[in-house]
């Protein structure tokens, strides 16, 4: 099916989603499976950049959700000491052999988890981390230990997600658009970006920066307060702002624009990408 045909089929299926079960066959199952496969291969994305704007393919997100209706719970093997898991979503790596790994061209360290319908591009390094379904991780990115890439999140090229970073998903609670980290960003350890916020190209978030839709993002130089988006080339740290009754509340502070000194501290190590 073409993307237009898939979209039409998914939108129709969405209207009768309460009637869809693991026993459902025919066009609904075919359309959902084809969409999940396209997401898994990276030929379709939940969100794609058009110029400077991001366009969300809401129907692709709906297909991810419909996949839960079509699949029954089953045992997943491979747990410690012969243990198992109980889930509906297959591993991206299910039934992979050396040929599939060679073709994929990324590195997956033992104990990383990637669920089917997430796309991982060539040159990516996955430390023991978690990438949820529908996500897109572009070339040359490092997903460091205990980092989480949430459902349908979009991660750009040559991004570094440091240890324990959380990139929010869109499925629960439901969000209109995915969280997006654009190319060449560095996200410091234990930082969180959630609720469909966007970190624009080349930005650096220091350790422990938390950004959601209601988080004030303050430009120290101009005093401007913004929400939901970090401008390109920003260096952001955790801060606070005065509120009512002498109480200070958390905010994220743009302390400067990325310069050569910042780049020297946050540049990726090509030796780790070979």
Curated annotation (Swiss-Prot):
Compartments where found: Cytoplasm
Main location: cytoplasm
Catalytic activity as recorded in UniProt: (S)-2,3,4,5-tetrahydrodipicolinate + succinyl-CoA + H2O = (S)-2-succinylamino-6-oxoheptanedioate + CoA
EC code(s) of this entry: 2.3.1.117
Residues where substrate binds: 107, 144
Coiled coil regions in record: none
Keywords: Acyltransferase, Amino-acid biosynthesis, Cytoplasm, Diaminopimelate biosynthesis, Lysine biosynthesis, Repeat, Transferase
Pfam families: Hexapep_2, THDPS_N_2
Top-level lineage group: Bacteria
One GO process term, biological-process aspect: diaminopimelate biosynthetic process
Record-linked SUPFAM superfamilies: Trimeric LpxA-like enzymes
Transmembrane segments annotated in the record for this chain: none
Root EC class: transferase
Gene Ontology molecular function: any one: nucleotidyltransferase activity
Pathway: Amino-acid biosynthesis; L-lysine biosynthesis via DAP pathway; LL-2,6-diaminopimelate from (S)-tetrahydrodipicolinate (succinylase route): step 1/3
PROSITE patterns from the UniProt entry: HEXAPEP_TRANSFERASES
Single GO cellular component term: cytoplasm
Assembly, per entry: Homotrimer.
PANTHER family listed in its UniProt record: 2,3,4,5-TETRAHYDROPYRIDINE-2,6-DICARBOXYLATE N-SUCCINYLTRANSFERASE, MOLYBDENUM COFACTOR GUANYLYLTRANSFERASE
Record family assignment: Belongs to the transferase hexapeptide repeat family.
Protein name: 2,3,4,5-tetrahydropyridine-2,6-dicarboxylate N-succinyltransferase
Protein's organism: Paracoccus denitrificans (strain Pd 1222)
